Amino acid sequence: GHIKLLAAERGEQDPFVILGGPCASFNPEPLAAFADLVIIGEGEEILPRLLEELERLRLEKKNRKEMLLAVAQLPGVYVPQFYEAQYNEDGAFSGLALLEKVPAQIQRQWVREIDDFPHTSAIISPYTEFANMFLVEVARGCGRHCRFCMAGYCFRRPRNRDLEGLLQDIRQ
C-alpha cells in the first residue's frame, strides 16, 4: 500500500505504475494521470526490454525523470507526463503536445509470431473473475472488422495459434 494515486505525486522512492492491456493501449488518456508508463500494444515483446532498461538505469543511479525519459524512447512506451493532451473547441481530442524530447508518435507493439509466447495461463489468485482457472489463448484479433469492437477493428487480421502446440500445452 501507500502508493500515491497520481503519477505527479510520486517521488524518487516510489515504484513505477505501469499500465497495459487493450483498454490502456487504445485510449490511455483517461488513465494518464495515474500512470507513470503505458505499454501501447501487446506487451510480450516490449515488457522484458523495458524491465531490463529500468534495472540498468536503476543500477546507474539515474533519477526518476531520467529513467522515464530513457524508457520513453523505447517503441511502445508512452510516458504521459512528457505529453499534454490537446482538445478542439468541441472537446474532441486533437493530439499531443510534446513537453520533453520524446517521440511524437508511440509505435504500437505487435507480436508477429504468437506461437513464440505461451499459449496458456493459470490464474492462481482467488481474487479475480477467472479465479483458479486454466486459460488457453487460441487466437488474437478477429477477421470481422466490426467498427464497434476493439478486437476486430483495432487488431484486424486474426492470428491463430498452432493447433498442435495448443494441444501439447493443454495436455501438460
Regions of interest found by a model, annotated:
Residues 79-84, 88, 93, 97-133:
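Ferredoxin-type iron-sulfur electron-transfer modules and their immediate structural context
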Residues 112-172:
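Radical SAM [4Fe-4S] cluster-binding motif and immediate context
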Residues 6-9, 44, 102-108, 117-118, ...:
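A generic short-segment signal for beta-strand/edge and adjacent turn/coil regions
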Residues 61, 105-108, 158-160:
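Short, exposed beta-strand "edge-strand" segments with a Pro/Gly-rich flavor and a Y/T-containing core
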Residues 1-99:
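Glycine-rich beta-alpha loop elements in corrinoid/cobalamin-binding modules
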